[in-house]
Amino acid sequence: MKNPRAGRPLHCRSVEELPGVTCFLPEGVPPARLRNVVLSVDEVEALRLADLEGMYHADAADKMKVSRQTFGRIIKSARKKVADALVGGKTICIEGGKITGSCLTGESEEPAVCICLHCGYEQPHVPGVPCRTANCPHCGKMLIRKGRYSRVD
């Protein structure tokens, strides 16, 4: 994925857990007319912290381990996408996002796994081959590395 902010590295955003649901479909829209809006996992986390838990942006930014300004950009993007989907009768899908490095500290005892956030498919990670270069054999969506998310207690 190309970095839209050339020269600026993308940093890991900490999320508490992966979303349990990865797609929302509008009722009454013919399948041929369905359009997708894709929310990244960090955008969903920003919505959860700011809108569901009612956290101030500065506190939510600290929890996600990003700057206040970055949090503001993430939440603005997420709200715009959700509004577009609701007003336009579009499907909301939650997929990967702008996560470029492992947020985990230390070595994991569990074997590395590539997962599909769309359908939940899992496959073993092949060392030296990024998960994002593979597609899910069930739904065709991009796979991501399961260890890309850190848990916040």
Swiss-Prot record:
InterPro entries: RNA_pol_sigma_r3/r4-like, UPF0251
Top-rank taxon, per record: Bacteria
Name of the protein in its database record: UPF0251 protein CT0950
PANTHER family given in the database record: PTHR37478, UPF0251 PROTEIN TK0562
HAMAP family hit by this protein: UPF0251 (MF_00674)
Family: Belongs to the UPF0251 family.
Species per Swiss-Prot/TrEMBL record: Chlorobaculum tepidum (strain ATCC 49652 / DSM 12025 / NBRC 103806 / TLS) (Chlorobium tepidum)
